[in-house]
Amino acid sequence: MIGRALSCTGIFCAIILFSAVSAAFPVQDIQKSAENERDIMQDERVTMLLNELKEKNSDGVLDKKEVKELLELSKELFGDENVHVNGLCKVTGIGGGLVIPPYLPITPVLIAVGAILLDTEGTNGHWCHAVHLAIMIPFVGGPIFIPPYYVIIAGFAGAVIGIALS
């Protein structure tokens, strides 16, 4: 009971802190990459990756081979140092952007776009990175989108691919 109260308090404090920071430093377009001011969704590499994901997910299920091919394509498009991977992991994240689909507790593919601080702990160890694109296959948990641009992710995933655009 105390652990739940502390984790809820921590999430609540993180939301308040994120709200205060975003109010102090207004975000004109949260989907723009900080370094090069390009719209993330207009990047042809992101479009190619999402189209490949859509093609592979046409039957609603991604098997291990398809996930591995998606990971290889991600590393080819964005560079090995910009792609972070974990498997069978706990996922938490907070940031600004968009999560698709929001509010569904179980989904075969969850995509988060924007500026997201993503923390995972699983078979590949622990990593915490700021990413622009996160793909979680499959996802069980709470993907929450709070307008205008807040994203909160808490749950478990079979595979997580986090991509930082450079």
Positions of PLM-derived features:
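N-terminal propeptides/leader regions of secreted preproproteins
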Residues: 25-96
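Generic serine detector
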Residues: 7, 19-22, 33, 58, ...
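Secretory targeting signatures
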Residues: 1-41
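Intrinsic-disorder/low-complexity peptide segments enriched for small residues
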Residues: 15, 47-51, 163
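Residues at secondary-structure transition points
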Residues: 16, 66, 101-102
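Mature secreted bioactive peptide module from preproproteins
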Residues: 76-166
